[in-house]
Regions:
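Core hydrophobic alpha-helical membrane-spanning segments
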Residues: 9-13
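Intrinsic disorder/low-complexity segments enriched in polar/small residues
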Residues: 6, 22-24
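Bacterial N-terminal signal peptides that target proteins for export
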Residues: 1-8
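Subset-of-secretome marker
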Residues: 24-156
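C-terminal motif of bacterial Sec signal peptides marking the signal peptidase cleavage site
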Residues: 16-19
């Protein structure tokens, strides 16, 4: 009888320990801002997928709307020049297009798979977001977007 009680106790303890340590799930933080200035409207939206204190993926969608095609062309050229050096980095993609009077820039980075050393080769300023082991902390990204004037909300 003592052996049965002991085995039951071991089983219950094992269940409690393993059952209560469920794997952390991915969550989302969305940072956004709208700017209206001099006949130009900007909608900025950054969707950050994270697990624990580390970022897994970031998708940014930046929209610039104006009736001035010269301004749109200038923004498009500037965005393409900025992101073109990243085009050969796996797990990093960008797309820039003009739809009517709106420029839409979409950038996606999967930080769980990206070669952060290649990111540093493109621009050493990227070192600000990476830890020594190539991870990106959520607090670093949140601080960066907050400095841009965005409001960030996290999943509960």
């Amino acid at each position: 009888m003592k052996k049965i009680k002991y085995l039951l106790l071991v089983l219950v303890m094992t269940f409690l320990i393993t059952g209560c340590q469920s794997e952390e799930t991915s969550k989302t933080m969305v940072c956004s801002r709208t700017i209206n200035q001099d006949a130009i409207s900007m909608d900025l939206k950054y969707t950050v997928t994270y697990k624990g204190k580390y970022v897994e993926k970031v998708e940014s969608i930046e929209k610039i709307t104006t009736d001035d095609t010269t301004v749109l062309d200038a923004y498009k050229q500037a965005v393409e020049t900025t992101y073109q050096p990243y085009s050969k980095i796996d797990n990093y993609s960008y797309d820039v297009k003009v739809d009517g009077n709106t420029l839409i820039s979409t950038v996606t980075a999967d930080y769980t798979k990206i070669d952060y050393k290649k990111m540093l080769e493109v621009d050493t300023a990227n070192q600000q977001i990476f830890t020594d082991d190539g991870k990106v902390k959520l607090e670093t990204i949140e601080s960066f977007y907050t400095k841009l004037g965005t409001n960030c909300t996290k999943d509960k």
